[in-house]
Structure formats: structure tokens, C-alpha cells
């Protein structure tokens, strides 16, 4: 079984969510007498080359993509070759197998939770908009604000090209310089949340933070 990672940087391995997924896949594969191969590369071209070798060289029986994004040429390749694969995340095609949850509802529920606690200046810090998970959680966030008659403010939404603590810290600085009265922060990733919390602690701000995908206690 081939695993396709979103990138080959340390960022992937820093995120506690992905190693936990890898452990689960490896355990089930081992129980069923399958081996795991990982397709990585520092950029899209290298990953496409790695997948091509797996597919055309018949090195694996199927692929699992550990991410989902728009117009992915890697997914396009395996789709055209009718090679078995599934995506961990969302797809717009009804013909693609996937494992996912309702991220629109998750974003809505997270935002509504804070609204019911009396918060009205809620910020959203997510990953790149190329990722479906970011798009969907943002949609849920916006739907909750609209349903409760709260204004949408683009200055309270931020999007990171990498899931790093530094990004969460940087965006928090920008956020609180813009609106010191921000009363809640939602992040789509635990590493971003750690950066937010670091900023809040340094500046002795008592603002609640809610994150997704955290596997750390």
C-alpha cells in the first residue's frame, strides 16, 4: 500500500495528527500482511514522479492520499490510470473513494459553541484555502455567524500555507493588533493553536481557543 503525503518537510511530521494516522494504517496493513511504502518529495513534481513509479512499476496494490485539495494532478493521474486509491478528506467527485467527516458542521458547531458562551468577536485561523478541510470549516464558521446575525469580518480570518506554531503566533499578533477585544479563536489545526496559545500566554490574554485534530492531551 502506498501512502501519499502532502509534502516532505518537517511540518508534516511535527503535526501530531498525521503520525497517529500512519500508526493506524500501518497496524491494519500489518494485520493483513501488507507492507507500506511512502511517496514523498519536496515538491509536486517529485511526488508525481514517486507515484508514477509506484503505479507503472506495480510496486503497490493501491494508494492512500493523506490529504485532499483542489485540482490535484496526482489524483488526476491515478484516476486516469484507474488505479485503486482513496482520499483522507473530501472530493467533489462521486466516483472517488474517501474517508472524511462533516467539516462544515464541525466548523458550524465550533463557532456556535462560542456564540452560546456569549462570544461575538470570533476569529478563524486555518490552513491554505486549497485544502477542502479549510474551505469547509470556514464555511461552517461563516454560516454560524450569519445564522446568529453576527457580522463577517475578513480581518478576523487567516490562512496559513503551512501548519506551523509560528504561523499561529504571527496571525494572533495581527489579529489582536486589529481587534484587542477578540473574544474567541478557532483554529483548524493543533499546531496553529499552540502558536495562538503561546501568543496569548505571553501577552496575558484570557481568550478561549478551540482547535481540531489534536491528539495531544
Residue ranges and their predicted role:
Residues 1-49, 146:
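Amphipathic helical "hinge" segments at domain boundaries
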Amino acid at each position: 500500500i502506498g501512502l501519499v503525503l502532502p509534502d516532505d518537510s518537517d511540518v508534516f511530521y511535527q503535526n501530531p495528527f498525521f503520525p497517529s494516522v500512519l500508526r493506524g494504517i500501518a497496524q491494519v496493513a500489518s494485520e493483513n500482511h501488507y507492507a507500506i511504502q511512502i511517496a514523498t518529495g519536496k515538491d509536486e513534481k517529485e511526488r508525481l514522479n514517486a507515484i508514477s513509479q509506484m503505479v507503472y512499476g506495480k510496486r503497490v496494490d493501491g494508494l492512500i492520499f493523506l490529504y485532499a485539495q483542489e485540482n490535484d494532478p496526482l489524483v488526476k493521474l491515478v484516476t486516469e490510470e484507474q488505479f485503486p486509491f482513496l482520499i483522507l478528506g473530501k472530493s467533489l467527485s462521486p466516483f472517488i473513494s474517501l474517508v472524511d467527516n462533516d467539516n462544515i458542521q464541525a466548523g458550524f458547531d465550533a463557532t456556535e459553541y462560542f456564540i452560546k458562551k456569549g462570544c461575538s468577536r470570533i476569529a478563524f485561523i486555518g490552513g491554505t484555502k486549497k485544502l477542502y478541510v479549510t474551505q469547509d470549516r470556514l464555511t461552517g464558521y461563516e454560516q454560524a455567524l450569519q445564522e446568529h446575525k453576527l457580522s463577517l469580518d475578513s480581518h478576523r480570518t487567516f490562512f496559513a500555507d503551512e501548519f506551523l506554531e509560528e504561523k499561529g503566533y504571527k496571525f494572533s499578533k495581527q489579529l489582536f493588533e486589529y481587534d484587542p477585544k477578540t473574544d474567541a479563536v478557532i483554529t483548524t489545526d493543533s499546531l496553529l493553536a499552540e502558536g495562538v496559545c503561546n501568543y496569548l500566554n505571553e501577552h496575558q490574554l484570557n481568550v478561549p481557543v478551540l482547535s481540531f485534530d489534536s491528539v495531544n492531551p
